[in-house]
Amino acid sequence: TTQRSSARYFQRPDAEYISVDSSLTSLSGYGSTIKLGRYSQKKIQFETSVTVRSPGLEFNDIGYMRYSDVIHHGTWVAYYLRDPFSIFNNFYLNTNYWMYWDFSGKLLSVLTNTNFSSQFKNRWFINGNLTRVGKNTSNTFLRGGPSIKLTGSTEMNLNIQTDQSKKIYANVGNYHGMGDQKRYRYHEYWMGINFRPMNALSVSFEPSYSIQN
């Protein structure tokens, strides 16, 4: 039924604020999003938002809904230098966070991320990011069973690319994902060499190496 669907799981045994009511033929609920931000050509931009989806919210034919029963708050702040300075043509830095609760008031997860990108005056390009997922609680992992606590993780990557307008250009990069309590480790390294003898022809060689444990 709709009450037992993956968007709700009203049958969860530890959810005292919701339950399956077999007499209902439809659900009622509400949802909304409020955003406040600054979007312009200025150096500093930001956005903060709150999204609410009550447990009984149902879109029906309006669109697909992955989940309900959530209160989400997120904020991002960006610093963007568009004009050349020092050795850079431009520079972009962004940091953000997300927090999720259910309608019982239980904090489900906290995520933070910082990322940057820049082009140098020699037209080389660099970007990277760092993401932290704190210890979190999932109401859906057991598909209708009780909530389960999941360990957090840290992810990061860095990429560098030479001038793409040249006939020969290259890129190197790496990714590292690490679960808390040594739950998992994943490391990947890659490089690429691209040769473009003419506009209609491009040849590339892109080996990679990964380690997982």
Residue ranges with predicted function:
Residues T2-N213:
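Exposed, low-structure sequence patches enriched in small/polar residues
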